[in-house]
Amino acid sequence: MMLLTLLILSSVGLAAAADPSLFSENDYSPDNIVNRDVLIVGGGAAGTHAAVRLKDLGKSFTLVEKSSVLGGHTHTYIDPTTGTPVEFGVHSFGNTSDTRDFFARFEIPLVDFVPARFPVHYIDFNTGDAVAVALDTNVTGYLDQVEKYPSLAYGWLTSFPVPSDLLLSFGDFVNKYSLQKIVYTIYYLGVGIGNILQQLTITVMNSVGVGILSGLQGVPGGAVVPAAGNNHAIFDKALAELRADILLNSHVVAASRPANNSGVKVVVQTPNSRKLVLAKRIIVAVLTQPENMNVFSPDEREARLFSQLKGQAFYVGLVTNTGLPVNQSYYNAASSEPDNVPLLPKTYNIQSTVLPGVFWWLYGSETALTEAAVKTAVTSQIATVRRALNVPAPAGSPQFLAFGNHTPTHVTVPAEAIASGFYRDLYGLQGYRNTWYTGAQFIDSASGIWNLTNAVVLPGLLTGL
């Protein structure tokens, strides 16, 4: 029986409990012991917003972020010559009260998002064939289906059992509702999902929802951006204000999370020292895959859920010296597929930006790749596009100005797990062992995450704090 139990726990990735001696206050100097109401793990859109809200609510916190900046998937390149900001991560934010309030908090005015329009060439990035994509932007039929599930706008699967349509592969869903004409449109709106026809319909709808579709249909005000440009400015301002309570280039080493509401102890490695954070609550604002959560010594209930999450590899960046004609964009389209949707691995598109000659690219893979491997693949497909257009190669190789790694993205679980109540159980972890959760595994948009934090996470976390 003991062997069977060990095998079961191993299969769900249950981590061993941390050495209790790690949490002894006697082993830390006074300046390396931090007492706070809340420890926040992750400084992306979710964690940064939670930190600002806690400060405004009069609660103390420490935020731990593994990189040197806040902002997560929001990347802005500033041209060194002109000072022009170029977005190569998050391009816009849903126009919700949560978004408007967050930007207003830092006195950043917003305007409607108007995407740049450049002539588009549809090319098979593998063969170099020009592809006649019959792009249909009339997504009314799909929108009618999405609107049946309003809770998906915030990642909340409040109905149970889960409707069977949501558990169909998107390919089967398309066939059921005769949506073949708009497959390529949904594909390019949902870049990063991966092989879209093989994904579950619920995954696609969670990414390509009412907000994105409203913008496509010409509804003004569906998305907003800072009036001065630079989507990353809000995170820069947040860092400047909260710097004393943020540990950058740092990571959690171990955590003690008793189930009796007696508070938590978390060991954090910073560039200069190891700190012991004593807190009443934890907000986990990173993906709860085992590689992130094993340091928190998940129990069987938690590990069973965390071990099931899988995501796609996704990379973004800016490149110049491509030899491609400027002020035009190039979309990958499979010449051999009836819906023209290419399979992974692939460069999704190579798009012009506001800087002439600088292109924004997006690359996806089913497995994680090194930065060098991604750049090699993108360079190869740039050459294929150039040959398709019959334009000469430039002197030298493409120059990569910026690179962002969004791996893993669009994390999800199999249909069987969802049907068995996976998301019900995942939401059921809110508050368990003094730990609360927010972030992209619930909803893949900043505005949706901020709503989740404001409406669900903070009210529960603040009770009794």
Curated annotation (Swiss-Prot):
Its main location: membrane. Belongs to the beta-cyclopiazonate dehydrogenase family. Disulfide bonds: none annotated. Induction: Expression is positively regulated by the azaphilone pigments (MonAzPs) gene cluster-specific transcription regulator pigB. The keyword Membrane applies. Gene3D superfamilies: 1.10.405.20, 3.30.70.1990, FAD/NAD(P)-binding domain. Its EC number is 1.21.-.-. The keyword Transport does not apply. GO terms for cellular component: plasma membrane; side of membrane. The lineage of its organism: Eukaryota, Fungi, Dikarya, Ascomycota, Pezizomycotina. This is FAD-dependent oxidoreductase pigF. It comes from Monascus ruber. As colorants, MonAzPs are widely used in various food products for centuries. Moreover, MonAzPs also possess wide-ranging biological activities such as antibacterial activity, preventing hypertension, lowering cholesterol levels, causing hypolipidemic effects, and displaying antiobesity and antitumor activities. Glycans are attached at N95, N138, N260, N327, N451. FAD-dependent oxidoreductase; part of the gene cluster that mediates the biosynthesis of azaphilone pigments (MonAzPs), a complex mixture of compounds with a common azaphilone skeleton very widely used as food colorants. Within the pathway, pigF desaturates C6(7) to afford the orange and red pigments from yellow pigments. The first step of the pathway is performed by the nrPKS pigA that forms the hexaketide precursor from successive condensations of five malonyl-CoA units, with a simple acetyl-CoA starter unit. It is found in: Cell membrane. Residues 1-17 form the signal peptide. A lipid is attached at D444 (GPI-anchor amidated aspartate). It is an enzyme of class 1 (oxidoreductase). It is a lipid-anchor; GPI-anchor. It comes from the Eukaryota. Pfam families: NAD_binding_8. Its cofactor is FAD. Keywords: Cell membrane, FAD, Flavoprotein, Glycoprotein, GPI-anchor, Lipoprotein, Membrane, Oxidoreductase, Pigment, Signal. Pathway: Secondary metabolite biosynthesis. Residues 445-465 form a propeptide. One of its GO terms (molecular function) is oxidoreductase activity.
